Curated annotation (Swiss-Prot):
It comes from Saccharomyces cerevisiae (strain YJM789). This is Cell wall mannoprotein PST1. The gene is PST1. It is found in: Cell membrane; Secreted, Cell wall. Residues 420-444 form a propeptide. Residues 359-418 are annotated as: Disordered. Keywords: Cell membrane, Cell wall, Glycoprotein, GPI-anchor, Lipoprotein, Membrane, Secreted, Signal. Residues 1-19 form the signal peptide.
Length: 444
């Protein structure tokens, strides 16, 4: 009797184990979906809850009010939520990886999006989300990030991200702060037309290819050492720029129309590969903080009502110079001395203050003033005319050169044209929008 009981118990255990195995094997670890799979209701999303991995591209839209993608850990493809005008919240907190892109676009009443476990994605686009107040993720790896036309007050979903190709944040009018641990930016870091009190903090950033900041209130880049291409500050409410560890800018360095700017501190900056443009910063009376700058590979262009310009270590300007101040207290003596020693090359040298003007036609191949046989020097008592950059010029130029994934391939050709505009003979009239476009295009 005991033997029969033991045999029966063993048989029951084997049967249960086989049933469990059969049940487990019926749950697929990977589910292939069509390249254009769509979900318009929660029941459509529930079909994927038995899959660890989705292979394909999933688009969510329609009349969905709240949405959740449960249990899925990986998408080998893209996840797009588009034009779901009734959607108020979405969560995919098991999702860890998306091999292509995460796109949230044209979701007019979406208030929150939660991707709490998401660590890796190729690109993220948060575009036209006028009601969103919360975006959660644990992103550690992303190539491209675009955040545009949202109501986010802060960007907190990237606190673990260390490197990125493109980080573009624009037209988020409620934005007040961005703090990021990113260490390298291999393409471009751009912030434009966000809230006018936005504070930018990238204190771990060591190297970037391009940085462009517009309509920013304060910035902190405590450890930035090198800009491979260009750096631009245009139409900000910044009061000071402190980049004390920065030593090299590969192309253009522009500081334009920052009305509240009073102080510059670039004490370690020694080389600018392209143009240095400092124009129409009305509060910047004394231009200093460039004490160790020795070489400007392009044009030196400084325009405003400044009383002093301290470039005491400057040895070489390769693209000519145009320095114009409305103040009669500004002296051109230091720049004229540098030009006479052959330190300023290019097409022309112009230096004006409120009382006098000096203009020299240069030979771009000459090595010194003494070797020139056709140089003409003219002086007059006419007052310097200010080159004024308006907000309309700035926005028109910025609009013409805005970053988008579709225009990335053409940006290099536009940039080369922009550099040509910057390098035009300074003695000639340069259209303001053209100059600003050139500046902005060169830092994209």
């Amino acid at each position: 009797m005991q033997l029969h009981s033991l045999i029966a118990s063993t048989a029951l255990l084997i049967t249960s184990a086989l049933a469990a195995t059969s049940s487990s094997s019926s749950i697929p670890s990977s589910c292939t979906i069509s390249s254009h799979a769509t979900a318009t209701a929660q029941s459509d999303l529930d079909k994927y809850s038995r899959c660890d991995t989705l292979v394909g591209n999933l688009t969510i839209g329609g009349g969905l009010k709240t949405g959740a993608l449960a249990n899925v850990k990986e998408i080998n493809g893209s996840l797009t939520i588009f034009n779901a005008t009734n959607l108020t919240s979405f969560a995919a907190d098991s999702l860890e990886s998306i091999t292509d892109s995460l796109n949230l676009q044209s979701l007019t009443i979406l208030t929150s999006a939660s991707f709490g476990s998401l660590q890796s994605v190729d690109s993220i686009k948060l575009i036209t989300l006028p009601a969103i107040s919360s975006f959660t993720s644990n992103i550690k790896s992303a190539n491209n990030i675009y955040i545009s036309d949202t109501s986010l007050q802060s960007v907190d979903g990237f606190s673990a991200l260390k490197k990125v190709n493109v980080f573009n944040v624009n037209n988020n009018k409620k934005l007040t702060s961005i703090k990021s641990p990113v260490e390298t930016v291999s393409d471009s870091l751009q912030f434009s037309f966000n809230g006018n009190q936005t504070k930018i903090t990238f204190d771990d950033l060591v190297w970037a290819n391009n940085i462009s900041l517009t309509d920013v209130h304060s910035v902190s880049f405590a450890n930035l050492q090198k800009i491979n291409s260009s750096l631009g500050f245009i139409n900000n409410s910044i009061s000071s720029l402190n980049f004390t560890k920065l030593n090299t800018i590969g192309q253009t360095f522009s500081i334009v129309s920052n009305d509240y700017l009073k102080n510059l501190s670039f004490s370690n900056l020694s080389t600018i590969g392209g143009a240095l443009v400092v124009a129409n910063n009305t509060g910047l009376q004394k231009i200093g903080g460039l004490d160790n700058l020795t070489t400007i590979g392009g044009t030196l262009e400084v325009v405003g009502n400044f009383t002093s310009l301290n470039l005491d270590s400057l040895k070489s300007v390769k693209g000519g110079a145009d320095v114009e101040s409305k103040s009669s207290n500004f002296s051109c003596n230091a720049l004229k001395a540098l030009q006479k020693k052959g330190g300023i090359k290019g097409e022309s040298f112009v230096c004006k203050n409120g009382a006098s003007s000096t203009s020299v036609k240069l030979s771009s191949t000459s090595k010194s003033q003494s070797s020139q046989t056709t140089a003409k020097v003219s002086k007059s008592s006419s007052k310097a005319e200010e080159k004024k950059f308006t907000s309309g010029d700035i926005k028109a130029a910025a609009s013409a050169s805005s970053v988008s994934s579709s225009s990335a391939s053409s940006s290099s050709s536009k940039s080369s044209k922009g550099n040509a505009a910057i390098m035009a003979p300074i003695g000639q009239t340069t259209p303001l929008v053209g100059l600003l476009t050139a500046i902005i295009m060169s830092i994209m």
